[in-house]
Amino acid sequence: MRLIPLTTAADVGKWAARHIVEKINAFKPSAERPFILGLPTGSSPLEAYKSLVAMHQAGLVSFKHVVTFNMDEYVGLPTDHPESYHTFMHQNFFNHIDIPRENINLLNGNAEDTTAECRRYEEKIKSYGKIHLFMGGVGNDGHIAFNEPASSLASRTRIKTLTEETRIANSRFFGGDVSLVPKFALTVGVGTLLDAEEVMILVTGRNKALALQAAVEGNVNHMWTISCLQLHAKAIMVCDEPSTMELKVKTVKYFRELETESMKNL
């Protein structure tokens, strides 16, 4: 596992965006051989999306031959609802880059048969071989996507019941009213994430410190879903200073020395 200990959330976004752009450009994608990118929503990736849009506008990257798969979507929210992840992705990213609409893949939280929708999504991912890079965030309780504590580490895309803690955390997007936050979501599974060639998780804020500690210094444990990344051959945790508060000083020092070159020129 790589740990990239940066100073601010803005630094995290810039580093993540630069890494994605480097990966896409090195891959040299084409219509016949697209780059497959997994994407999250929420507050964690906002700075990364801003940086990606800026790099695209500067002519440093094209998304014309990039295919995206989003991590999750609420069940029951209309696609055009201001808090649907369809709306979030288009407002914060897709509307500002040159990605073809047909290359965008989002789960349908209003599907009549959610089991069939989840199966379709898994099959669509497999039709491309694999996701080359999956970017994600992490919840206060260590969940990735909507794989809440005690999720199977072999799980695939499915419907999940959201914990009260997650709904309370997400209520900030619904005017602080927990009753407006959906109780269910469709989400890629832990196994789906682990199938990706590379997984990059963005961790920002003091409230994520225990989750980061569990991911880096703890044991693999389904109660801390994020710890599954210890099993991945190419996992990267990109974090700001407040999120490292629960890590040992020597852990942060070790990774800072290892990643000196990669953290330059942000």
UniProtKB/Swiss-Prot annotation:
The record marks S151, R158, K160, T161, Y254 as: Part of the allosteric site. Allosterically activated by N-acetylglucosamine 6-phosphate (GlcNAc6P). Signal peptide: none annotated. One of its GO terms (cellular component) is cytoplasm. The active site is at D72 (proton acceptor), D141 (for ring-opening step), H143 (proton acceptor), E148 (for ring-opening step). Its EC number is 3.5.99.6. PROSITE patterns: GLC_GALNAC_ISOMERASE. GO terms for molecular function: glucosamine-6-phosphate deaminase activity; identical protein binding. It is an enzyme of class 3 (hydrolase). One of its GO terms (biological process) is N-acetylglucosamine catabolic process. Keywords: Allosteric enzyme, Carbohydrate metabolism, Hydrolase. It catalyses: alpha-D-glucosamine 6-phosphate + H2O = beta-D-fructose 6-phosphate + NH4(+). Pathway: Amino-sugar metabolism; N-acetylneuraminate degradation; D-fructose 6-phosphate from N-acetylneuraminate: step 5/5. Homohexamer. Catalyzes the reversible isomerization-deamination of glucosamine 6-phosphate (GlcN6P) to form fructose 6-phosphate (Fru6P) and ammonium ion. Belongs to the glucosamine/galactosamine-6-phosphate isomerase family. NagB subfamily. This is Glucosamine-6-phosphate deaminase. It comes from Pectobacterium carotovorum subsp. carotovorum (strain PC1).
